[in-house]
Amino acid sequence: MILLHFVYSLWALLLIPLINAEEFTPKVTKTIAQDSFEILSFDDSNTLIRKQDTSVTISFDDGETWEKVEGIEGEITWIYIDPFNRHDRAVATAMNGSYLYITNDQGKSWERITLPDSGESISPRGCYIETHPLNKNYFLAKCNYCEKTEVNNDNEENSGDEEGEFEIFNITRCTDKVFASNDGGKSFSEIKSSLERNENSPISISDCGFAKTSKDSDLESSDTSIICLFQNMQFIMDEFSSPYTESKLVLTTDWGKSLKEFDQFKDKVVNGYRILKSHMVVLTQGDRYNDMSSMDVWVSNDLSSFKMAYMPTQLRHSMQGEIYEDAMGRIILLMSRERSDQEEDKGIVSEILISDSQGLKFSPIPWTANEVFGYINLYQPTYLKGTMIASLYPLSRRRNRKGKAKGVKSKGVTKISVDNGLTWTMLKVVDPDNADSFDCDITDFENCSLQNMFYTREGSTPTAGILMTTGIVGDGSVFDWGDQRTFISRDGGLTWKLAFDFPCLYAVGDYGNVIVAIPYNADEDDDPQSEFYYSLDQGKTWTEYQLETTIYPNEVMNTTPDGSGAKFILNGFTLAHMDGTTNFIYAIDFSTAFNDKTCEENDFEDWNLAEGKCVNGVKYKIRRRKQDAQCLVKKVFEDLQLFETACDKCTEADYECAFEFVRDATGKCVPDYNLIVLSDVCDKTKKKTVPVKPLQLVKGDKCKKPMTVKSVDISCEGVPKKGTNDKEIVVTENKFDFKIQFYQYFDTVTDESLLMINSRGEAYISHDGGQTIKRFDSNGETIIEVVFNPYFNSSAYLFGSKGSIFSTHDRGYSFMTAKLPEARQLGMPLDFNAKAQDTFIYYGGKNCESILSPECHAVAYLTNDGGETFTEMLDNAIHCEFAGSLFKYPSNEDMVMCQVKEKSSQTRSLVSSTDFFQDDKNTVFENIIGYLSTGGYIIVAVPHENNELRAYVTIDGTEFAEAKFPYDEDVGKQEAFTILESEKGSIFLHLATNLVPGRDFGNLLKSNSNGTSFVTLEHAVNRNTFGYVDFEKIQGLEGIILTNIVSNSDKVAENKEDKQLKTKITFNEGSDWNFLKPPKRDSEGKKFSCSSKSLDECSLHLHGYTERKDIRDTYSSGSALGMMFGVGNVGPNLLPYKECSTFFTTDGGETWAEVKKTPHQWEYGDHGGILVLVPENSETDSISYSTDFGKTWKDYKFCADKVLVKDITTVPRDSALRFLLFGEAADIGGSSFRTYTIDFRNIFERQCDFDITGKESADYKYSPLSSKSNCLFGHQTEFLRKTDENCFIGNIPLSEFSRNIKNCSCTRQDFECDYNFYKANDGTCKLVKGLSPANAADVCKKEPDLIEYFESSGYRKIPLSTCEGGLKLDAPSSPHACPGKEKEFKEKYSVSAGPFAFIFISILLIIFFAAWFVYDRGIRRNGGFARFGEIRLGDDGLIENNNTDRVVNNIVKSGFYVFSNIGSLLQHTKTNIAHAISKIRGRFGNRTGPSYSSLIHDQFLDEADDLLAGHDEDANDLSSFMDQGSNFEIEEDDVPTLEEEHTSYTDQPTTTDVPDALPEGNEENIDRPDSTAPSNENQ
């Protein structure tokens, strides 16, 4: 009984304080205001300020009462507390930016500071003040000014300036200006930019800051040191809209009077800088012409010398404001991911890199390195030393089958470290009372833990280990933000318990003993009014306080920033008022809780950070109030005190890996070859190995007794020495236990993103060219197919084995996951709309329990929302095209064409629709073999009788025309053809003439502009059984094509010999072909074995398209103009691949050089500024590279062990300086697959200086493709090319900068044969025997408005040619009337009788009157015709009474003189002719015909039109165009006498009299000795 009484008494004693606590109600004071969203606190005071509308209000009693600040005039845009003088200083900025207000006494008085007037209008960014941490009188005022100019948004096309200028945006010019003051703002001086601003720079940036950024700064600098970054930016009007930036980073110590530039950054573009406590960090942009290029990080501790930090990945989208330093001096970089402008979450953090304590080697958070990409957040409470909480939210969004019913779900994982990131654990939920409310077993921490995302970088209010957060509990496989709840921790985040079932805003006070929380949604407790909850026992129990109004909480905060006070501000708003938002500001006061009792010593306990372990060589503890103590600490304005005790012995936790080492999977520091190359350890020794300690003590660690660290011998074999370019090459190796079976880059300049699929069906993504590779989380599904959108370069689609489709539109940074229609996957590719990114067609199988089931058939499903929803579009469709989006002038933009194969039939039909087959369905062809689209054409293969094919072409989707193939004796049935490509108005097609497997070949054809009329370009062009053809157009250059022909095609067709291939090249789009000229000597300086002058017997031959392992490995690159690699040999024909060498050309194929004796793989970088070769089919540890366009080659060892390189690649535009090698190495127990990223960026001294208008500069000159280049396609062209090998080009569309020097006169090379004509051995176009020219009147049917047509001359001008004048081989005949248009034709070419008769009669009357007047006044009056013979010039006997008489007499005398001379001339001529005839008859006795002394090209061209007269069936046979000179010498005895040289030449010459060649150049160059015609391959 006594015991029970004692228990009851004890219970009562404990209960009474709790009852008192429950009875306690905080003091709540409400203030109603308009448009007030931010409240600021002065440190260690009761004063608060806020901006209300455009004025400033202040409270001196922790927010209970407010008053307007009277000393501030005008409209205020924003206010802020001075971060270095938080106790008493605040700044208010005026709307116009010309002045601001400062208080130095917590708002009691305000001083107006007037800024210098620049004479320019201030921008909305206005001005703001930066203060100094040590001197209150030091100010930097940063202002932005913009000129009052209209923004021109016109997007007119380039006018086509000769030098390829890019248009500069005409936008408002804005300028940053910085003003400095050292007298508290009484006077300012401008720190002027040291960059000269030109008229094309719309933006000028000046960013200055004090070198000291904290009161405990470790940087070696004076108090007056100021760092300034000046930038001028201008924009290039190209497809990337890239800004061009020039910059200077300077230091001033005399307030801008003198500026000292940092030498290390003189030739670099400084993107930004950040001054920290111990470091200055500078970011330099890798490419000044691409603001999305990767950046380098430079670190300095003394503001004089900078070192480049090692980055494990490319830094492209850093958040410069989010570069900071932790307590250990480590630099933390937050990397944002680039997003489109339409996305709301643009700029969110995607990766976090943390340096070592020296700031020179960065690495990602370890457990995120091999995870998928996503949003990453790092929370480091400064008052909890060593604590880091990281959250990863992968960018894979999942939607349900219908897309929206269940909302957006995502995966996430959160981990915590209390030892500076050395070890990480899950956020454990230890809450037995609420265990049943979770969907997983909270005792299984690895699979059931707290996941959160919304921590800020630093905790705002210090507490003794008491933290709150919102999140969910699970295994990370499902994360729905709508299911968030609120949790609390009392041990610094290691363990958590549930506080509320809903998410809340929260704030803590009294070092965590008072907590206030308010739900985001007022309806959480089923009543419409808002409420807040508070706890006085560190979250153990909660009490509700009901508010009378429904508000949307904006912020809840402790009025003392150091967390020592017990007063709070709750700021919320309501939208109930029509005139704007109304704010409700609640002041909440807990200072009298527990009957105003203050805690005593026995109310406190020790709380140890990191569970009492050593952190940074120190054990930390905090004295905090016991949870159930009935008191408040009440040490207002005192900072939370942290007690530390140095640890006696140092452990491995106090060390980090030395620069040359990295941690392996077990946590051991092991040597890294790439880091060894970057360091200087091997520069200090001549030995093969050097001892290096793998561990170094963390900078700032306070442990007392260092650990003994043994050195490790590092191999220096193959490590480049300091001072060599090879020293600057950076290689990153990745090893895998699987093979990469597929890879493809996204074709953008934003970054070097690529997607890879391994042999297990797993997807991997890299955004830095393979340097870092991360796995894509497909939720357990095997990836069975990958499709890239050919029209939108950032989009790709991954097909999962369980019916999911994963789509990305940002190069793999994020994925949207949707379910495919409930149909069997057939493996058919997607078909995309060329103008709508989210519209595509998917093909699935219906009734396909078995793929062989007779009911199984394909169905085309349409999506317009990127795959969220699909609708069934057409049954039995196996291939569709969005035809309306492909044509330049479509008949209907919504037209879709589909190939349909019915279940019961083997035939296929082509149908079209303009409403996705809802109501409109039109059958275009009843029976087809297939169809495809290329270059604005759709070509349909239709079966014909006798197993032949016919092709039909359309350019609008409605009208189809049969493609007319040329008649040729070697073409039998049209059984197979391959569309090669379509560009600039013509289709190239290969028509098979021999289809015996292994012996395939055919003819190369080219169409006219509408794709309907084809002519033969070359015979016996090689193809393989799969239809691939040895045909390649050289990228970036007009009209250059390489093909391989079967030289022994007749015997191959007869099955007597195997194929013998020869390589041919054309420089005028197939009109003329030649064999490749071989180099005179090989790569070793030796002559080649074959030395025949005939190219038919000795030329260069290259392996072509049909033998490639990867069809992307082309000879040429669109960005490296004129350059080509190829594997081949010099000889009579092509040898087997293994017996060949590697050849290279820089002039588009005119001349070649052997660069390697064996087959090599090649790749272009930096627009050809860096060339890389690697041996093919043999193990190697080295690559060869050239920076002088192949003139010299250097070898570089990229790995320690030899590997078999499977492929070498880079970005599709070949503009990067980094290459990716895929290799396979033999290891113990098998082989391992490896990738090597080789970065050449640092071997160049600088970036080339480029004028964005395309003008020549010191580093770029215009030059022809080769010294022998003359006219090509009717014009002479020069290309802008780099001249200095020591600089790199970067992201400049260099291939687009060219200029035409002039248009040339037309020559034979500007023409090709017309339809039904063929090119004879002599170079002329002749009509095919037995055929007539194409019916020219057909054009009248295609164009009903025409009234006339012209007959073909046998030639047609090459579409690419711009020649003017000269030879007119395509000159049309006389016009003929179109059928049915005879009347219009006559009207066009006849003249009306009435007007003509009037004019004719009028002229006759005038002539008659004039003649009569002259006769009457000049002849009859002077004696008539009888005296006509007596008149002499100057005769005075004529009658002249006035001026009229004198004029008439002069006319008569002049006429007499003219007629008398004509008579004399006729008489003299008659005599000479008789004399000449006599001599000619004498010579006919000894000669058989006339001869010419010298017939030069000019004379020939003068007669060209005459030679072409007649239009006979041989197309005005010009005899031949063989390789002969244009001047013809004759024998001495044939030289005529002087008289003979005047022999009249009036007859038209016969074909035997025409010269044998037309020169290759134009008329202006005919006298040059090297002006010769191309050789003919059949001579």
UniProtKB/Swiss-Prot annotation:
Region (Disordered): 1533-1579
Coiled-coil zones: none
Residues in the Cytoplasmic compartment per record: 1415-1579
Predominant subcellular localization, coarse grouping: Golgi
Residues that carry a glycan: N96, N170, N447, N793, N1010, N1303
Ranges of the BNR repeats in the UniProt entry: 58-68, 101-111, 181-189, 416-425, 487-497, 533-543, 764-774, 861-871, 1143-1152, 1185-1194
SMART domains named in the record: VPS10
BP GO terms, sorted: Golgi to endosome transport; Golgi to vacuole transport; protein targeting to vacuole
One family name in Pfam for this protein: Sortilin-Vps10
Top-level taxonomic group: Eukaryota
Name recorded for this polypeptide: Vacuolar protein sorting/targeting protein PEP1
Organism: Saccharomyces cerevisiae (strain YJM789)
Lineage: Eukaryota, Fungi, Dikarya, Ascomycota, Saccharomycotina
Name of the coding gene: PEP1
